[in-house]
Curated annotation (Swiss-Prot):
GO terms for biological process: chemotaxis. The keyword Flavoprotein does not apply. This is Vespid chemotactic peptide L. Belongs to the MCD family. Crabrolin subfamily. Mast cell degranulating peptide. Induces the chemotaxis of neutrophils. Its mast cell degranulation activity may be related to the activation of G-protein coupled receptors in mast cells as well as interaction with other proteins located in cell endosomal membranes in the mast cells. It is found in: Secreted. Keywords: Amidation, Chemotaxis, G-protein coupled receptor impairing toxin, Mast cell degranulation, Secreted, Toxin. The keyword Secreted applies. Expressed by the venom gland. One of its GO terms (molecular function) is toxin activity. GO terms for cellular component: extracellular region. It comes from Vespula lewisii. The modification Leucine amide is found at residue 13.
Length: 13
């Protein structure tokens, strides 16, 4: 995934 997507996912977790 893109760094932006990964950041969003990590934020949800």
């Amino acid at each position: 995934f893109l760094p932006i997507i990964a950041k969003l996912v990590s934020g949800l977790l």
